[in-house]
Amino acid sequence: MTPEDFYMALKELGFDLSQKQKDQFQRYFELLVEWNEKINLTAITDKDEVFLKHFYDSLAPVLQGHIKNQSIQLLDIGAGAGFPSLPIKILCPNLDVTIIDSLNRRITFLNFLSDELGLSGVHFYHGRAEDFGQDKAFRAQFDIVTARAVARMQVLSELTIPFLKVGGQLIALKAAAADQELVDARNALNVLFAKPILNENYKLPNGDGRNITIIDKKKETPNKYPRRAGIPNKKPL
């Protein structure tokens, strides 16, 4: 998917990018490849592949109507090089975006990237989701939490649901169908007072399969969740 194909595909879906937004995506690509020489950000560095498998892929929640350009709080857990939240931020500049990532080098990249792209309303924190999830400044503060290929739902739910306000949504993006994951996560979601409202398979323009799962938070998360760092992965709910 060339940049021109990318812009045309977005336009056909009702998103006519400004020159500034096009420049932001172009500069994002350049910095991603440049910094990838120094720190491991991605295995995908071919321009057409980045525009398809990172940028277009990240925008699925917006293109499908689940995230709109409004002034709400979005948290991205384990965003790595900023996916999916920073492409979403470029397309929806009114969003307030927070990223938590466990590698400080990636946070350094994200700070530099956001300055270069002229993004405002973005905040980056180094640390573990389990620790931030027990911090009152972060717990139950977000309308949406995104996670792209972070962990299976049984684990991911404990790492993300505590950050949501009641009525907020977890939007999880994956490469494979999530049916079995949701079966395995049934107990975790019950314990966390959360409920799946969407589990949908779709295809990228090149035919690659993808999945989007949306989970609603129904009630306040019990205080003991998330458990200490590492425990959700070792002993899933």
Curated annotation (Swiss-Prot):
Disulfide bonds: none annotated. The keyword Cytoplasm applies. The keyword Methyltransferase applies. GO terms for cellular component: cytosol. It holds the Pfam family GidB. Gene3D superfamilies: Vaccinia Virus protein VP39. S-adenosyl-L-methionine binds at residues 78, 83, 129-130, 148. InterPro entries: rRNA_ssu_MeTfrase_G, SAM-dependent_MTases_sf. It is found in: Cytoplasm. One of its GO terms (molecular function) is rRNA (guanine-N7-)-methyltransferase activity. Its EC number is 2.1.1.-. It comes from the Bacteria. Keywords: Cytoplasm, Methyltransferase, rRNA processing, S-adenosyl-L-methionine, Transferase. PANTHER family: S-ADENOSYL-L-METHIONINE-DEPENDENT METHYLTRANSFERASES SUPERFAMILY PROTEIN (PTHR31760:SF0). Belongs to the methyltransferase superfamily. RNA methyltransferase RsmG family. NCBIfam families: rsmG_gidB. Specifically methylates the N7 position of a guanine in 16S rRNA. This is Ribosomal RNA small subunit methyltransferase G. The gene is rsmG.
